[in-house]
């Protein structure tokens, strides 16, 4: 009996810690396929990165800071936490060449090897980054680069999760045709003698912004991609125009470095601009890696000063940038794109017409995000035109600016509309509602919208107290609720508004 009680208490404790974000979610439990087990050898098809089955893959992850400075954050424990809690599928080991990096201290390559070995064990992809920066012309240390990549490719040529990035950010008096392309041809030749298949990423001019130049004079190798780097506070539509041009020319792009800050790595964070960039990358299925995993006191860092070097970070140890990046990786994990859950059947004797089912994507009463998941179902006998239907989720924001994201919708996130409405007179459990609408679509009798997964957060990423919100309740399965209201052409047709 005592043993049974002990087991029960242990299970309860694990459940509480998991809900509180102190332990990895069940999605990371043993038995779940790792990214590499699922996708295997990567290759290029057109402009797309594809897996062994030829299906498009979008990798998302984070980069180390310079290994010579912040290498202590790069270890198996931290990468495991990033895989299990953040959901990363790729990690970038940024080995600076100058500034106390490989050229002055070749032993820093041992940290690269540690990262690769950890990634192999954990089943995630890893980018070996020859991180030129102040030494802006890649030819300055070309022979050292060839020496380094000869060693790396001889070690990992049969390892499908390795990706080579052979010139981080060429800059200064450097151009593609004269400097970067000839360098790349020589280094690629060295790698291909040992590794015929793995992806190679080549930096482009002006700190890896001139993908348009590379697109006009592409390398011959079939599995080469071109690096695009941006910082949300500095770079905008003009750089996306360059990316669009490169894609139109058939040049595959990998964003191996981007930051929520300005180009200095400090200043900001610029979350609206970051969101605009990530929406763009998602629309093109472009893989990305965020800068950076460190506790350096600058806005692009993911961790606050003094955070653990081995993972296990509570949300309070994450910076605004780290919180944003974590949620944008977690929100698009493969688990949200599997076959949608089948909702429980409505009781047709009680629920005529259109109804709502809900579950809490984040059941914590104190959380920096609200994640309602909805099904809207037609229980009636007539087809419903969704463009005439809106749903309202009622909650308290306490005068904070609101942000909306759609993590997944069976009918497509692009088919949704939304607006936040502040009540002139607060009601019980609500001073605001989110109104969700639809651009197109119909629901035939008995049909459902399928799973709609939403995510809301305050501008400053502060916590909500969800326990007081009218529409919120803790449920990890879909349940019918009348506290999320439905309207047809503005007229209430389902549920009860708060008093």
Swiss-Prot record:
<keyword id="KW-0378">Hydrolase</keyword>
<dbReference type="GO" id="GO:0008810">
    <property type="term" value="F:cellulase activity"/>
</dbReference>
<feature type="binding site">
    <location>
        <position position="231"/>
    </location>
    <ligand>
        <name>substrate</name>
    </ligand>
</feature>
<keyword id="KW-0732">Signal</keyword>
<keyword id="KW-0136">Cellulose degradation</keyword>
<feature type="region of interest" description="Disordered">
    <location>
        <begin position="330"/>
        <end position="353"/>
    </location>
</feature>
<dbReference type="InterPro" id="IPR001547">
    <property type="entry name" value="Glyco_hydro_5"/>
</dbReference>
<feature type="binding site">
    <location>
        <position position="96"/>
    </location>
    <ligand>
        <name>substrate</name>
    </ligand>
</feature>
<dbReference type="InterPro" id="IPR008965">
    <property type="entry name" value="CBM2/CBM3_carb-bd_dom_sf"/>
</dbReference>
<comment type="similarity">
    <text>Belongs to the glycosyl hydrolase 5 (cellulase A) family.</text>
</comment>
<feature type="active site" description="Proton donor">
    <location>
        <position position="169"/>
    </location>
</feature>
<feature type="binding site">
    <location>
        <begin position="296"/>
        <end position="298"/>
    </location>
    <ligand>
        <name>substrate</name>
    </ligand>
</feature>
<feature type="compositionally biased region" description="Basic and acidic residues">
    <location>
        <begin position="330"/>
        <end position="340"/>
    </location>
</feature>
<dbReference type="InterPro" id="IPR017853">
    <property type="entry name" value="Glycoside_hydrolase_SF"/>
</dbReference>
<feature type="binding site">
    <location>
        <begin position="263"/>
        <end position="264"/>
    </location>
    <ligand>
        <name>substrate</name>
    </ligand>
</feature>
<keyword id="KW-0624">Polysaccharide degradation</keyword>
<keyword id="KW-0119">Carbohydrate metabolism</keyword>
<dbReference type="GO" id="GO:0030245">
    <property type="term" value="P:cellulose catabolic process"/>
</dbReference>
<protein>
    <recommendedName>
        <fullName>Endoglucanase</fullName>
        <ecNumber>3.2.1.4</ecNumber>
    </recommendedName>
</protein>
<feature type="binding site">
    <location>
        <position position="291"/>
    </location>
    <ligand>
        <name>substrate</name>
    </ligand>
</feature>
<keyword id="KW-0326">Glycosidase</keyword>
<dbReference type="Pfam" id="PF00150">
    <property type="entry name" value="Cellulase"/>
</dbReference>
<feature type="binding site">
    <location>
        <position position="65"/>
    </location>
    <ligand>
        <name>substrate</name>
    </ligand>
</feature>
<feature type="domain" description="CBM3">
    <location>
        <begin position="350"/>
        <end position="499"/>
    </location>
</feature>
<dbReference type="GO" id="GO:0030248">
    <property type="term" value="F:cellulose binding"/>
</dbReference>
<dbReference type="InterPro" id="IPR018087">
    <property type="entry name" value="Glyco_hydro_5_CS"/>
</dbReference>
<feature type="active site" description="Nucleophile">
    <location>
        <position position="257"/>
    </location>
</feature>
<dbReference type="InterPro" id="IPR036966">
    <property type="entry name" value="CBM3_sf"/>
</dbReference>
<feature type="signal peptide">
    <location>
        <begin position="1"/>
        <end position="29"/>
    </location>
</feature>
<feature type="binding site">
    <location>
        <begin position="69"/>
        <end position="70"/>
    </location>
    <ligand>
        <name>substrate</name>
    </ligand>
</feature>
<dbReference type="InterPro" id="IPR001956">
    <property type="entry name" value="CBM3"/>
</dbReference>
<feature type="binding site">
    <location>
        <position position="131"/>
    </location>
    <ligand>
        <name>substrate</name>
    </ligand>
</feature>
<dbReference type="Pfam" id="PF00942">
    <property type="entry name" value="CBM_3"/>
</dbReference>
């Amino acid at each position: 009996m005592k043993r049974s009680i002990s087991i029960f208490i242990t299970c309860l404790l694990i459940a509480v810690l998991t809900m509180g974000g102190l332990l990895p979610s069940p999605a990371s439990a043993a038995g779940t396929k790792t990214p590499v087990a699922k996708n295997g050898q990567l290759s290029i098809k057109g402009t797309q990165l594809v897996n062994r089955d030829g299906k498009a893959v979008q990798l998302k992850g984070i980069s180390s800071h310079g290994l010579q400075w912040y290498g202590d954050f790069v270890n198996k424990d931290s990468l495991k936490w990033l895989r299990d809690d953040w959901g990363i599928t790729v990690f970038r080991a940024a080995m600076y060449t100058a500034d106390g990096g490989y050229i002055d201290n070749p032993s820093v390559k041992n940290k690269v090897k540690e990262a690769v070995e950890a990634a192999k064990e954990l089943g995630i992809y890893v980018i070996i980054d020859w991180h030129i920066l102040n030494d802006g012309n890649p030819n300055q240390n070309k022979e050292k680069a060839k020496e380094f990549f000869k060693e790396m490719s001889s070690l990992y040529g049969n390892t499908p999760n390795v990706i080579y990035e052979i010139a981080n950010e060429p800059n200064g008096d450097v151009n593609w045709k004269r400097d970067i392309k000839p360098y790349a041809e020589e280094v690629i030749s060295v790698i291909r003698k040992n590794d015929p298949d793995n992806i190679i990423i080549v930096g482009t001019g002006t700190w890896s912004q001139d993908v348009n130049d590379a697109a006009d004079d592409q390398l011959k190798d079939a599995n080469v991609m071109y690096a695009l780097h941006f910082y949300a506070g500095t770079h905008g539509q003009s750089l996306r125009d360059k990316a669009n041009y490169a894609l139109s020319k058939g040049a595959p792009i990998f964003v191996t470095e981007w930051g929520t800050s300005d180009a200095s790595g400090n200043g900001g964070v610029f979350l609206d601009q970051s969101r605009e960039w990530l929406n763009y990358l998602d629309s093109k299925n472009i893989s990305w890696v965020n800068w950076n995993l460190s506790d350096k006191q600058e806005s692009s860092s993911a961790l606050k000063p003094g955070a653990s070097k081995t993972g296990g970070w509570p949300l309070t140890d994450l910076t605004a940038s780290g919180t944003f990046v974590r949620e944008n990786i977690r929100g698009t994990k493969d688990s949200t794109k599997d076959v949608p859950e089948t909702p429980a059947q409505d009781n047709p004797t009680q629920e005529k017409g259109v109804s709502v089912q809900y579950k809490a994507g984040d059941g914590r009463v104190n959380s920096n995000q609200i994640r309602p998941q909805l099904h809207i179902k037609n229980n009636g006998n007539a087809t419903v035109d969704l463009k005439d239907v809106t749903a309202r989720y009622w909650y308290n924001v306490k005068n904070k600016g609101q942000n909306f994201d759609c993590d997944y919708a069976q009918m497509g996130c692009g088919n949704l509309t939304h607006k936040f409405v502040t009540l002139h007179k607060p009601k019980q459990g609500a001073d605001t509602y989110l109104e969700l609408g639809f651009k197109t679509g119909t629901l035939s009798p008995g049909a459902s919208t399928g799973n709609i997964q939403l995510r809301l957060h305050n501008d400053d990423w502060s916590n909500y107290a969800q326990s007081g919100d009218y529409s919120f309740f803790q449920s990890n399965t879909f349940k019918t609720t009348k506290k999320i209201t439905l309207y047809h052409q503005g007229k209430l047709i389902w549920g009860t508004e708060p008093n």
